[in-house]
Design a protein with these regions (language model features):
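Membrane-embedded alpha-helical segments and adjacent helix-loop junctions characteristic
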Residues: 1-69
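Juxtamembrane and boundary regions of transmembrane helices in multi-pass small-molecule transporters
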Residues: 4-10, 43, 61-103, 109-167, ...
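Transmembrane helical segments that form the transport core of multi-pass membrane transport proteins
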Residues: 30, 174-179
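Residues on a specific face of well-ordered alpha-helices
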Residues: 52-55, 101, 105
Length: 179
């Protein structure tokens, strides 16, 4: 639904406009957004929801830029940030990923110890808060060197895209409310 009404494109443009056009800032935004959503929605569903948004960011890049090594590294890091952010965020709550609930059920059955939602979060959220910066450093400093400045032509492209989009339609609003 997000793709049908181009809401994913609007979200991507808004996210970049908010965070700036530096690759490392965009990676941080996608990591945090994926992790936050994944704490309350299955990590698989989160990745499926965020992937079209990340792909639309990659598609916003000028065609000539796709051939540079920096942009290829950014594109790969961006897609990995969705996957890693969703996986990391899913550890934060019982409902973030199905194995969490399975583990809680197993512990309740075998050891007669009940782990509540809040109890899980007392351990899970600090783990997420420590893991996310580590993932960010790995993606932006170790695997890919992304602080080479802003993406070429991205600021002008964002302005043009925002102007071309206009106001949100009813269908976009309905999809945004559902998600």
């Amino acid at each position: 639904a997000m793709q049908r009404w181009n809401l994913h494109r609007r979200v991507a443009i808004g996210l970049i406009g908010l965070l700036g056009t530096k690759p490392s800032a965009i990676i941080a935004g996608f990591l945090m957004a994926s992790a936050l959503v994944s704490m309350w929605v299955s990590n698989t569903a989160t990745a499926l929801m965020m992937l079209p948004i990340a792909l639309s960011v990659v598609q916003l890049l000028p065609e000539r830029a796709h051939q540079t090594r920096e942009v290829q590294g950014f594109s790969t890091a961006l897609l990995l940030s969705v996957a890693y952010g969703a996986t990391t965020g899913g550890m934060g709550t019982l409902i973030g990923t199905p194995p969490n609930a399975l583990l809680a059920g197993y512990i309740a059955d075998i050891h007669d110890v009940t782990i509540g939602f809040g109890q899980w979060m007392l351990i899970g959220v600090p783990v997420v808060l420590v893991a996310l910066p580590a993932v960010y450093v790995v993606l932006t400093r170790i695997m890919f060197t992304l602080d080479a400045g802003e993406l070429p032509g991205m600021a002008e492209l964002i302005k043009a895209e925002k102007a071309a989009q206009g106001r949100m339609g009813r269908a976009e609003i309905a999809v945004a409310v559902v998600f």
